[in-house]
Amino acid sequence: MSKKLSIIVPVYNMAAEGKLNYCLDSLVGQTIRGLYDYEILCVDDASTDASLEILLDYEKRYPELIHVIPNAVNLRQGGAKNEGLKVAQGEWIGFIDSDDWVSPDYYEKLLQKAEETGADLVGCDYSLVDHHTFEVGKVIVNNTPEQTGELTKEKHEILFIRPGSMVLKIYRHSVIRENCLDFPEHIFYEDNCAGPLWSLYFRHFERVEEPLYYYYQHEVSTVHHITEEKCRDRMRAAELLYTECRNRGFLTEYKEQIEYRFTELYYAITLFSYLSGVKKPKLSFVIELRLGTEKHFPEFDKNPYYLQYTGPEEQKLIAMQKKSDLRFFVYYRLRQFVWNLRASD
């Protein structure tokens, strides 16, 4: 590897409101500049706005830092990240969403932690903000102390269950390359598959207990609009996670963890976000969620992680659906109708 760090930035239609500029400015202004040789790999995922023009302008201004990779067709974020991984030269790999930004010392602190501890995976916390600022907003703890240190089987189990966001970490490139790790393409929620799977291959995880990453909350964010297409993408991510874990020999050793993550992603999260967020939900889709989960894990509701982490109300509703899909569907829709009436008063 000829560089210390490769930062991969998937970009799709982020030209408006200075979002892309603010992200790129935070990357070229890193304090590691001059300390380490690093690269910023900007993958334009067939944008239909001026994103590519902005990227090419930054590449012209910072030729020693920025390399633009234009995709001819849209591959979604996972595919864009894969294109960056194909050409990355860094000893370490970092990812950032193109509408977010990072503190000037973000990568310096993560790399320093890696050098001090010998970790091959380093993360931090993040700040929720609704405008461009370096003032800290609501702080979200991304990972916890019991997940850090040398990754024993027990710690791998905890990290698999709650891997945290992938953009808040740097990854030793050799681990990615040697284990053929990449992202699902053509779907939303690619990290739902990649995050847990990747975590099983790293041997030492450390974290910087500071909110060094700024997560920009706005209305066009992937996670803020629920459609059946996006719900199906989450289901697909869960299926891919199951398949990858099975094919890579993890299904026996980490069965309870895989069962829970599959149930959470494919069924529980998707079920309630679908019913709450889609205007005209379909009973057939709700039935599909239950059957798809029971196909792999017929006794998912006895899983210890499910019993521990799934809320009592959600468990009650899912138990109702297991007895009668129609009764559950009618009950939930009526309850939601009543809530909406009260909210409009």
Features from the language model and the residues they span:
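Membrane-interface aromatic/basic loop that binds lipid-linked glycans or pyrophosphate carriers
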Residues: 119, 276-345
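Short, well-formed alpha-helical segments that are part of the catalytic scaffolds
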Residues: 14-31
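Cell-envelope/extracellular polymer assembly enzymes that use nucleotide-activated donors
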Residues: 4-8, 39, 193
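Short aromatic/hydrophobic "clamp" motif used to bind/position activated sugar donors
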Residues: 93
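A conserved acidic beta->alpha catalytic loop
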Residues: 26, 44-53, 73
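Donor-binding/catalytic cores of nucleotide-activated saccharide
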Residues: 101-205, 217-226
